[in-house]
Amino acid sequence: RQFFGLVMAAQALIYGISQPIAGLLADRYGSIRVIIAGALLYAIGLYWAGISGDSWDLMMSLGVVVGLGLSGPTQVLVLGAVGKVVPNERRSMVFGTVIASTSLGMFFFVPGGQQLVEALGWRDAFIFLAVLIALLPLIAIGLRGAPAIESDGPKQSIWEAILEARGHSGYVLLTLGFFVCG
């Protein structure tokens, strides 16, 4: 149990650190690609956990790979992608539905995951969940073709954007809040 707690702490830390990187990649390559890549990494990590041979396999699979994978299909990137394909007059309703769906998903997923562990054992439960998560990119097909958002402002490099954001106190406080609370 103690080692599993360490694995989950590593996952949370890697997830938190990789969030801004996922955002930068989404800006450069598009949200859909990052969402799909993240979901596939997440599925690979879950599958690897299911076939793991020792505790360090669990650290690498659930801690590192799943931590990185979770940074892709997050609300921020999903809402950004959805916002590009939904008309302005429906955007608030759709955003609310997406956000509520994530909460509802957690409400059902946690006890459902426990039922899977009890029915299949933890290894097969991870493999089953890996297959389920690997299907997630199919949902992103509906978001394809979203037009790129063109900025009227000057082009910035990633580092210029980071330095500008770092100089804004609101961004720093928001980042600290998310770092502490997730």
How does the language model describe each region?
Residues 12-20, 106-107:
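Residue-level signature of mid-helix packing/kink "hotspots" within the transmembrane helices
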Residues 51-61:
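Helix-loop junctions at membrane interfaces in 12-TM secondary transporters
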Residues 97-144:
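Helix-loop-helix hairpin linking two adjacent transmembrane segments in secondary transporters
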Residues 40-53:
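C-terminal ends and interior cores of transmembrane alpha-helices
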Residues 147-174:
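Juxtamembrane intracellular "pre-TM" segments in multi-pass secondary transporters
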Residues 62-100:
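Cytoplasmic helix-loop-helix junction between adjacent transmembrane helices
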Residues 18-30:
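Helix-to-loop junctions at the C-terminal end of transmembrane segments
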